[in-house]
């Protein structure tokens, strides 16, 4: 197979792809065709007679590894069973399966996940005679990971934390278990202890590529540089401007380490962007140049300047969400976009609730990434089921979910008897509950539990037409918060988070009923259910995600929400050193460069904090780093606002009408 790389790639891509001997540093800017270059580089190596079994390509997700392998396979048109395209952790696991016995482990070791480790740490605390209540075990687990990976110094010997840590390490080995950190750490130890094994691995993989190199940790870099040390055919591809994972150990300084360790390297920069318009790239370039410790690069495009970047100021976070929802509808009408053309990006998960609920209530299908969907959270699903049984006595499914949630003495045997009775009488579970609540076949305690539950349902039904306090009453009557505290005995923060979610749902319900004249509780439940019913069939959905989750993705239209100081840059970054501010700036850069055609930057004068309190906010200081000439203000006349609201209302009513016909 021969490849004419020069005709398939641009000049810089060609230079990077055609060098296959010796170390190589490829700085690939956002949207610069990095994946295409990597694909053709591997294909070119195969065309030059390099055996596929000698090539190792490492990346960070299974999805990326599979995509890389699939693209190379399509390009060369043959099976590549011996080509190794994998993640760092999968590669490390493979090495341990072959060589872990040299560290005193048995080959039948078990891989522990985070929850396994948390349980093990709890056991160690108890074994040593300490009190579980004195420790936040999840926080302890995070510290242990940082100790193990040498990201922070070990605590002094003799301290309780050091004693628990040492016990945990000893117990892991005694149990013949490893965790995800060990998948990198232990292969390094094997290579250091047994140089002949390192040489065997070096002979096997003579040509190594690392994608997303800026995301590697110091230990991951150490592992790969040890393997590459003999033949020095190591190509690393990355962009220091997109290094946004320091909190999980990524160290963009590895680019500098690579330059020191491989002084004979060749270096290439991919700066031509195939994704975004000129104005979007100008904003990104103007922003990121304020980071001093970076490789000099400037993205450019031949696709023209495109539309100006829109910046919008809102009175509140709720009005920001409604404006974005309305504007998505407007752009779809005017430019024939699909829902899947839109990405809505936020800095933190806490900003998602208002946006997601607004989209759902506005009949905009939404897919949540980088955080859990508000409507998928257990406590929210529970509350919605409580509400559903009040407006629909035929909804057996919802009743089954909450009949003993929280536990009220209605056990599985009782529920099965109610279900059998409903089947025999061809009636609903609700009626079975009413008719059997005094049945002598049940114990007195069971009858009382059934009757008390029925009384609660009747009381709640009386509040359906004035539902402002309905959810508060349900929470109080069922002792729901006590159940949550039982589930999270060690975390007041988790309890507060879940109870705030219920309060937020209550506020959304009240707001919906105030804003939609003559609307009922049933209407609200329908509005939040329509999207859920259609999601499986309708793949065209707006993507709502964190900026971290957006890395590697692109959208025709991007809305950035909550672009305010203490959100981006985060409050923690503002309190700490400039290095943290630089990472926040890189995160904003990543968010901007997800946009292909249009970019909307939004901020609000006030916003609710995590406790639900309204706080005054200021626009992000990063906005001052982008030239005003690139911005246009998205102001609306009252007539335009009214027109948009009427149009959205009509669309909503039409969707409800069609839903009812089904």
Language model: regions and residue ranges:
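Helicase C-terminal subdomain and adjacent C-terminal extension
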Residues: 606-662
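Short glycine-/polar-rich loops that comprise or flank the Walker A/P-loop
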Residues: 22, 50-54, 80-82, 230-233, ...
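A basic/glycine-biased coupling hinge at the interface between accessory DNA-binding modules
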Residues: 2-4, 21-24, 29-32, 43-207, ...
